[in-house]
């Protein structure tokens, strides 16, 4: 989807806030712990290349989801370690090795396929994934991990790290978290040749379970200034939300009692009122279920009326504002604020999803 620079809808990304958020977390973790910045999914909608360059002096490496995301960073001149968190099949290994990209290997089946396809792993850097209870990818026993590490070394790979991921580190009930932690510790203790790097700490673990940090952390959502738990747990230190979303009024009119607005005529005016049109819609990631939510105009909350369309939404205004008047969808407007978590709560989802759904049709301004 092409970025639409010739309309007023933009996302503003504060790179300094991201740098300060990472620094705040680093102050609360032990010295010598390696920091990976998680910039998958275009840095959660903030711009992977721009964020990675901004954090270059502060972090030891980056985590991405797949090979294409890793190659994007290499092509942008990022020369620090890049770890792919997802599974890369053996037929893509040559690109990974050629670009010094570290891969995750999560099963003995992967080794079997590599051997079947006669793939060598000479020069390949690997982190092994352990499934301690997340249930997605990873090995489940020390025996399996030992066999995998031995097999990888036979094929010429350098096994640098081993890691896991917690399912409930952002929840108040830490029963499942502790079960996973003990599972992982026991598995690590059973390794015959433990890799140099051991990491399990995502954003939530880094800030609420710092006593469980091994020797590396993966900082994702906290880097962008958001609480991993939404609003369930209090942050131990302040963060700055790095992304704001704004647009402008492009049409203002008065409607009369009985007039309807939007697809399905789901909104009927009870009296005469001003309606403003804003050029953002579900194609931009502002989903249809945002009808009834409010945005900010002139420091006042204005309700979204009628269904959100693909490219536009409509809001009830307290008066007739001039065309071009600023509309804030995420961020501050005259001392009032709408957070990404406010939107997530309204949608009954998580703040991660709100950011990741913001499409590339919305230009990012830095």
Curated annotation (Swiss-Prot):
Presence of the UniProt keyword Transferase in the record: no
GO annotation (BP), single: peptidoglycan biosynthetic process
InterPro entries in the record: Ala_racemase (IPR000821), Ala_racemase/Decarboxylase_C (IPR009006), Ala_racemase_C (IPR011079), Ala_racemase_N (IPR001608), Ala_racemase_pyridoxalP-BS (IPR020622), PLP-binding_barrel (IPR029066)
Xref: SMART domains: Ala_racemase_C
A GO term from the CC aspect: cytosol
Entry keywords, A to Z: Isomerase, Pyridoxal phosphate
Pathway(s) this gene product operates in, as recorded in its UniProt entry: Amino-acid biosynthesis; D-alanine biosynthesis; D-alanine from L-alanine: step 1/1
A GO term for molecular function: pyridoxal phosphate binding
EC assignment: 5.1.1.1
Enzyme class: isomerase
Reactions mediated catalytically: L-alanine = D-alanine
Cofactor(s) in the UniProt record: pyridoxal 5'-phosphate
Short name of any one Pfam family annotated for the protein: Ala_racemase_C
Record flagged with keyword Isomerase: yes
Binding residues annotated for substrate, in chain numbering: 136, 310
Active site per database record: 40 (proton acceptor), 263 (proton acceptor)
Modified residues (N6-(pyridoxal phosphate)lysine): 40
Function, in words: Catalyzes the interconversion of L-alanine and D-alanine. May also act on other amino acids.
Family: Belongs to the alanine racemase family.
The protein's name in its UniProt record: Alanine racemase
Organism of derivation: Streptococcus pyogenes serotype M28 (strain MGAS6180)
Gene: alr
